Design a protein with these regions (language model features):
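N-terminal, active-site-proximal structural segment of metallo-dependent hydrolase catalytic domains
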Residues: 21-112, 122-128, 310-318, 342-347
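Active-site beta-strand/loop signature of hydrolases that rely on acidic residues for catalysis
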Residues: 34-39, 64, 69-72, 76-103, ...
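Structured beta-strand-rich core segments of catalytic domains in phosphoester-bond hydrolases
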Residues: 39, 91, 97-182
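Second-shell loop/turn segments in exported
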Residues: 60-67, 88-94, 119-120, 149-151, ...
Length: 347
C-alpha cells in the first residue's frame, strides 16, 4: 500500500512539476507561437434546427456519434499539443467549428494551458464558424468583432472574426483576423468572385486600421480557399512574398506562406496537387526590427508523422476524419500552419 501511495505521489509530483515548468517557461519567454487550422467539421451530435447539420447527427449520412465526436477531440488535441515543440500554440485560429460548445469540449483536453475562446456565430448555412483560442497567461482580450462578407451569389457566408489581443509581456496590441473564405465549389474560376469580395471587404477594414495607426500590428490567418499567388491575395490584399533579411522598408502585408507555395508545399491535398490555402499573413510592422518581430523562417506547414496518410489516393496528405461519407477516424483534411514571433525589447 505504501508503495502504491509512493508511486501515486511521484506521478502527481511529475504532473505538477511539468505544468509548473511550462508556466515558468512562458513567464520568462519573450516569444509566442501562432497557428491556424481548418479542423474539418467539428460538429456536436445535436440537431440545430436553424442550420444544415443533418449529416453530422447519429442518424445522419455520416453517422456522427458521441464516440466519433470524442475520438475527434482527442485527435485534434494530439496535433495541437504537438505544435510549438510540444508546448502547443499560444494562439490558434480554428476553422469549421459548429459552435462555442465544441470548442469548450476541445480545450478541456489541455491541462497545461489556460485557453480562452473568442467566437461568434456566423450565418453560414451549415453552421460552421471561425474561432480563436489563446492562452490567457500570454495574451489578454481587448475586443472581439465580426466582419460580414457579402458575396455576389447572395448566399450567407462565414464572418471574418477580428480579435484584438494584448501581448502581456509588453502590452502591445495585436489584431488577429481569422478567415474562412468562400469555397471553390463549382470551380475555381466560377467561385473566384466570392473570394474577391471577401478580400475587398477585409482590405477596407484593414485600411481603416492603418489610417488610425500606420504601424498597426496585424496577423491574418485561416483558410482562404485561394493560394498566395491568386488575385484575391496578391492583388486585392497586396500580400507579397518577401526577403526575410531585407524587409525594414517594406509597407503593407507580407505573406509568410508564399515561399512554402513556391517550394511545392501545401496544407491541403486536392487530387494529387498541393494547395497552400491555409496561410498566415502579417503587417510589415511585424518585420521592421522593432518591438514584436516575426522570427525569420519559422513559418511551417505542421505535419506530424502520425497525421500523415500512408497509403491510397491521399498518400502523404493529412489523414482526414471522413473521405466522402466513409469514416476514416483521422484528424483533418488540412494540415495546420504555424509561425513564431519574438519581443525584441520590452517597452
Amino acid at each position: 500500500m505504501n508503495k502504491k501511495l509512493t508511486t501515486t505521489g511521484i506521478i502527481y509530483f511529475l504532473f505538477v512539476f511539468i505544468n509548473y515548468s511550462i508556466a515558468q517557461i512562458k513567464e520568462n519567454d519573450n516569444t509566442f507561437y501562432v497557428a491556424s487550422w481548418n479542423i474539418e467539421n467539428l460538429f456536436d451530435t445535436f440537431d440545430n434546427p436553424e442550420t444544415n447539420d443533418e449529416d453530422f447527427l447519429p442518424e445522419g449520412d455520416n453517422q456522427w456519434t458521441e464516440d466519433r465526436f470524442q475520438h475527434k477531440l482527442g485527435n485534434l488535441a494530439k496535433v495541437i499539443n504537438y505544435m510549438n515543440d510540444g508546448c502547443g500554440p499560444d494562439v490558434i485560429g480554428l476553422l469549421e467549428v459548429e459552435n462555442i460548445n465544441v470548442i469548450k469540449w476541445l480545450i478541456y483536453k489541455f491541462k497545461d494551458r489556460d485557453y480562452i475562446i473568442a467566437h461568434r456565430d456566423s450565418p453560414d448555412q451549415r453552421g460552421i464558424d471561425a474561432a480563436l483560442i489563446f492562452d490567457r497567461n500570454v495574451f489578454g482580450i481587448v475586443d472581439i468583432d465580426t466582419i460580414r462578407v457579402n458575396i455576389p451569389t447572395g448566399i450567407p457566408t462565414r464572418y471574418i472574426l477580428h480579435v484584438t489581443l494584448k501581448f502581456l509581456r509588453d502590452n502591445s496590441i495585436i489584431h488577429f483576423f481569422v478567415n474562412h473564405w468562400p469555397s471553390r465549389r463549382g470551380g475555381e474560376a466560377k467561385s473566384e468572385p466570392n473570394r474577391i469580395a471577401a478580400a475587398k471587404t477585409l482590405m477596407e477594414y484593414l485600411e481603416k486600421l492603418f489610417d488610425e495607426d500606420k504601424k498597426s500590428r496585424i496577423i491574418l490567418l485561416g483558410d482562404f480557399n485561394d493560394e498566395p499567388d491568386n488575385r484575391s491575395i496578391i492583388q486585392i490584399l497586396g500580400a507579397k512574398d518577401f526577403d526575410c533579411d531585407s524587409t525594414k522598408n517594406e509597407i503593407g502585408l507580407l505573406n509568410l506562406s508564399y515561399k512554402s507555395k513556391t517550394k511545392g508545399e501545401g496544407s491541403y491535398l486536392f487530387g494529387s496537387a498541393w494547395n497552400m490555402i491555409d496561410q498566415i499573413i502579417i503587417s510589415s510592422s511585424l518585420k521592421d526590427g522593432k518591438d514584436i518581430e516575426y522570427i525569420c523562417n519559422s513559418f511551417s506547414v505542421i505535419k506530424p508523422e502520425f497525421m500523415v496518410s500512408k497509403e491510397g489516393s491521399r498518400k502523404d496528405g493529412p489523414l482526414p476524419t471522413y473521405s466522402g461519407n466513409r469514416y476514416i477516424g483521422g484528424y483533418s483534411d488540412h494540415f495546420p500552419v504555424g509561425a513564431k514571433f519574438i519581443l525584441l525589447k520590452e517597452k
